[in-house]
Amino acid sequence: MSGFDNLNSGFYQTSYSIDEQSQQSYDYGGSGGPYSKQYAGCEYSQQGRFVPPDMMQPQQTYTGQIYQPTQAYPPPTPQTFYGDSFEEEPPLLEELGINFDHIWQKTLTVLHPLRASDGSIMNETDLAGPVVFCLAFGATLLLAGKIQFGYVYGISAIGCLGMFCLLNLMSMTGVSFGCVASVLGYCLLPMILLSSFAVVFSLQGMVGILLTATIIGWCSFSASKIFISALAMDGQQLLVAYPCALLYGVFALISVF
């Protein structure tokens, strides 16, 4: 046993002392150690993950105000989300499809049936003018003591549906329902003149019959001419004008009686 004690005492003989450990200090957070110089730009999270310096977020400086935190990034602008400014957006009327220049050109085409019509303009779906003309037609009937708004809208819907089916069977290119409703609505303008005459005098005499026949021919001729120019239906104007005359004849009967 004495030999074993001597061996242990010789094995553990070092220059290390516990008293020296208490006197020695280690600076892990400061800049005194060798590791602080080499890894000063790195950050170690609580879970022990290494974060490179280029991925570190800039620290916010304290402003001294509790309810007003410091903004690390500038606030986003509306241009960031939408891409373009509000000044570059199209006008509201253009987004709704309302073009007063085209409305005026279509109105002049109806008022001048012998004038050459532009098929590209008439092929557009524009319901702003037809709605206004339907309201004006109902208003003039109301001035004559006839409350026929329901009949006007009902006959208009049925007539547009019938012409839509007929034109799709007759034309090679086909036509949309909006285009048919737009053309028939614009060609209702002469019928507003007939209902306005009915406010002043009666249309049940010979003069009224001649005026009614003229207005029906005017409306049907304008509508058929626009349809054949927009759909390239040369030589079929009479075939298109006949159903148009039947439709506008119903509106004329409402105005006369």
From Swiss-Prot:
Residues 146, 195-196 are lumenal. It is found in: Endoplasmic reticulum membrane; Golgi apparatus, cis-Golgi network membrane; Cytoplasmic vesicle, COPII-coated vesicle. GO terms for cellular component: COPII-coated ER to Golgi transport vesicle; endoplasmic reticulum exit site; endoplasmic reticulum membrane; nuclear outer membrane-endoplasmic reticulum membrane network; trans-Golgi network. One of its GO terms (biological process) is Golgi organization. Residues 75-106 are annotated as: Interaction with Sec23. It holds the Pfam family Yip1. It is a multi-pass membrane protein. Its main location: endoplasmic reticulum. The chain crosses the membrane at residues 125-145, 147-167, 174-194, 197-217, 237-257. Residues 1-124, 168-173, 218-236 are cytoplasmic. Keywords: Cytoplasmic vesicle, Endoplasmic reticulum, ER-Golgi transport, Golgi apparatus, Membrane, Protein transport, Transmembrane, Transmembrane helix, Transport. PANTHER family: GOLGI MEMBRANE PROTEIN YIP1 (PTHR21236), PROTEIN YIPF5 (PTHR21236:SF6). Interacts with the COPII coat components Sec23 (SEC23A and/or SEC23B) and Sec24 (SEC24A and/or SEC24B). Interacts with YIF1A. May interact with RAB1A. Interacts with YIPF3 and YIPF4. Plays a role in transport between endoplasmic reticulum and Golgi. In pancreatic beta cells, required to transport proinsulin from endoplasmic reticulum into the Golgi. Belongs to the YIP1 family. This is Protein YIPF5.
